[in-house]
Amino acid sequence: MLITFNFEVHQPHRLNKEINQNGNTLWEKYVDTKLNKEVFNKVANKCYIPTNELILELIDEYDFKVNYSITGVFVEQALEFNDYVLDLFKDLVKTGNVELIAETYHHSLTSLFETEDEFIEDIEMHRKMYKEIFGFKAKVFRNTELIYNNRIAKIAKDLGFKAIFTEGIEKILGWRSPNYLYQSPDGMKILLRNYRLSDDIGFRFSARDWDQYPLTADKYAIWLASTPGEVINIYMDYETFGEHHWKETGIFEFLRYLPIEIAKHEHLEVVNVSEVVDRLEPRGEIYVHEFATISWADTERDVSAWLGNKMQRISFEKLKDIGKFIKENSNKLKKLNKFDEIYKMYKVLQTSDNLYYQSIKGLSDMSVHNYFSHFDTPFDAYASYLNILYDFEYYIKELLAKSEFDKNNRRKDGQKQYEKDDEVKKESLINTNIIVAKDDKTESIYIEDEEGKKNKRYERDEGFIIA
């Protein structure tokens, strides 16, 4: 039995609750840099740094293997707020025991757009980041929050990926097990997350009312060993360690002893995801229509976490409208040297978290949404996001209108200057006398001004006529 441990590493650029009207740039107006720095460094100290250091030890001592999907917006914040975190991830990749899984740079919902160009653009941006920061070329792709359908799988396959990750949910499997490799109708290999075994760590580890509490490394290894199939893919938020479950819960001790306990079961082997793809053959086909798109979010495991209510859908449609407007006016914005700044902000606004905060689901799902949100209520999140969208749109339109106004003024000023110059020329001709001096070879043209001075203008060969 092959085992993979996979972790999502992501931090969004959280937006200001109120637009900063004193901001000199779009970033200062819309992005809460202070809050982002506070959150990033808090999570770095509680999760990223201790977990990375521990996994480096586990690799060194037990040849442990893990896989990460690291978003571009996370890397941007690491570079700005805490480069030691990024250095640790680089060290992990250099061990050769860590595989990076590709995803969307901005952790966006572009895969749900009508056209695929922005989705592909976000993936290619992410690929470029992996190459520049880590010197790594990813072979396996996972979409934002494991959002998946046949179309998404085909796009990933066309981009050259060997396999794609998604949720091993019953509605796509029926009676089948998630513990095998599958393929899409287009032949893209599919890795399925075992959500029960993943959530045992990710959500239930510190739940004292859980009938399996406390979860120990030896107990979990026994569960893995007794699970039938060919591969178990464990996938969770990296902040599981130290942030969602604090150090005091014993989560780090669990992770420290997990490789030791797994090694006690000879038929278990911890591998990287590309090894699974290379060593196993697909056991069947998974068909997921666009209208039945799945994800790993909430109990429904569909896209309702981001598009489940009217507020979210209004926000999503407005965002797409602004994107179309920016593209239609891209050449004008480039001439104004404003396109890059505007397009980057548009990309930041695409991050799925902005719509996730607007969910109004109940019970356990709502508590998870609230946990991640920096807004008091989903309605505050909606009002703030829509306010930024409309302000952003107004800024672009005002910029273009001012440019057109200035252009028209320059045209009018140019016309007035032309007319003025024309009048001066006419006056000049009236107040001057033209004298022609000829010799055998050339004729010289002189203009005699009002003071009687002769100014030679040019010479011309024969045939010159003055009317």
UniProtKB/Swiss-Prot annotation:
CDD domains (UniProt xref): GH57N_MJA1_like (cd10795)
Pfam families, sorted: Glyco_hydro_57
Entry's EC annotation: 3.2.1.1
Keywords per UniProt: Carbohydrate metabolism, Glycosidase, Hydrolase
The keyword Cell inner membrane belongs to this UniProt entry's keyword annotation: no
Keyword set includes Repeat: no
Reaction catalysis annotation: Endohydrolysis of (1->4)-alpha-D-glucosidic linkages in polysaccharides containing three or more (1->4)-alpha-linked D-glucose units
Cross-referenced Gene3D superfamilies: 3.20.110.20
Active site: residue positions: E145 (nucleophile)
Gene Ontology BP, a term: carbohydrate metabolic process
Molecular-function annotations in GO: alpha-amylase activity
Alphabetized InterPro entries for the sequence: GH57_Enzymes, Glyco_hydro/deAcase_b/a-brl, Glyco_hydro_57_N
Protein family membership: Belongs to the glycosyl hydrolase 57 family.
Protein's name in the database: Putative alpha-amylase
UniProt source species: Methanocaldococcus jannaschii (strain ATCC 43067 / DSM 2661 / JAL-1 / JCM 10045 / NBRC 100440)
